[in-house]
Amino acid sequence: MKAQFWSFDAVFAMTIFGSSLLIITFIWMGVTNQFSLAYGFGLQTMQAQVQSLQNRILTSGSPQNWNAAINATNSSTWRNVSVGLGIGVGSQLSLNKIMTLMAMSSYSTASYQATKPLLGVGYDYYILINSSNATMAMGLYPYTRNPYAVQVARQSAVLNGVPVRVQVIVWTNKSFGVS
């Protein structure tokens, strides 16, 4: 019986090896599926937030004259405000509201972070308004901060009777999935 390959030891070793391989395969598939689901939901959330922000920009906000009701450099006055850049008529934007949001988002890192809930976003944001003679930007520019994921939405609007192009970017430099 010394020359037989199918001895008890060989069968036992193959069973252990096969079981180990099977367990590793199940673990590997579970981790990759978990990562895939987390990444997918993260992108879906970002897409929803960029669409929501794009729509919110055209609203007048709450209250309609929110920019007159706050101090742009004091985030404690922003409590009961929802930010919108529109005047409440179609796709017309308010220069005063744009300038107020620019001041709010660029005053300090803490004030920028405080503007995110006012805009309804949990990720970082960047809003760019371009016309033939002016460019206005609010938020953090993503491409100098090594973004992990970026979602962009574009729309046309009117500012002081001049057509403008609004680009809304929601981005993050953190992973969505398992770290």
Residue ranges and their predicted role:
Residues 1-18:
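Glycine-centered recognition micro-motifs in short, flexible terminal segments and loops
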Residues 15, 22-179:
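Long, compositionally biased, intrinsically disordered regions
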